[in-house]
Regions:
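Bacterial Sec signal peptide processing site at the extreme N-terminus
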Residues: 17-37
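Terminal, low-structured helical/coil segments at or just beyond the last alpha-helical repeat
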Residues: 132-214
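TPR/TPR-like (Sel1-like) alpha-helical repeat modules
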Residues: 51, 99, 107-134, 159-167
Length: 214
């Protein structure tokens, strides 16, 4: 019996790799939808499964976030604070610019009793988010950047939150509520920006088609 040559196995390997990637992507989307609906236990199970299969999985292009950020955030939301801290610290070790992960690390620390360090992390995350939106809306103003926070509502909210955080006697429950709102709002903003960009592209294509036919 002749041995199979390496190149004869390549299509099968590529097929299996593609199927695995599709499965991981599908699991992630199921987890993300569960998270956005507030079903954090289900979301955590999905995210943990994705992390086991592909620990380097990243979601998003304009504002990429690693799978460890999602695992840590849902660990926080389900009250698993020690695990959330470890996971979020790992996420930041892999990418120091993941401000949503930093925000939830701060929330985790505040809830665990380390308010001073927690507030520091929350403040740093808020500044990072604000600066990123400012940068992307200017640097990519003729492309996808124009669809991020077009009315500056999110940036205005962050500025208000930063003023509250910088106060020495910031109310802890209010701080937690505002930071949790920001984490969810930042996640939703990416979806809204993508929808608006897709809608605009469809309108442009329709307009181009009508013009070409005249």
């Amino acid at each position: 019996m002749k041995a199979l040559r390496p190149f004869t196995l390549l299509p099968a390997v590529l097929l299996l790799t593609g199927c695995a990637s599709l499965q991981v992507g599908s699991e992630f989307q199921s987890g993300r939808q569960a998270m956005l609906r507030g079903n954090d236990e289900a979301a955590l199970a999905y995210f943990q499964s994705v992390a086991q299969k592909d620990p380097n999985y990243t979601y998003g292009t304009a504002y990429p976030q690693g799978i460890l950020s999602y695992v840590g955030r849902t660990e926080y939301s389900t009250g698993k604070l020690p695990q959330a801290r470890q996971t979020l610290e790992r996420a930041l070790a892999a990418n120091r610019r993941e401000d949503v992960a930093r925000l939830y690390l701060g929330l985790t620390l505040v809830r665990a009793g380390d308010r001073a360090q927690g507030v520091k992390e929350i403040e740093g995350a808020m500044k990072g988010m604000y600066d990123w939106i400012e940068y992307i809306t200017e640097a990519q103003r003729f492309s996808f950047g124009q669809f991020w926070d077009p009315g500056r509502d999110l940036r205005s909210a962050i500025q208000t939150q930063l003023a509250m955080v910088s106060g020495r006697e910031a109310d802890t429950p209010k701080l937690i509520a505002e930071a949790e709102w920001l984490g969810k709002r930042m996640e939703e903003e990416g979806d809204r920006a993508r929808r608006d960009e897709t809608t605009q592209q469809s309108r442009d294509n329709e307009g181009g088609g009508r013009s070409g036919g005249q």
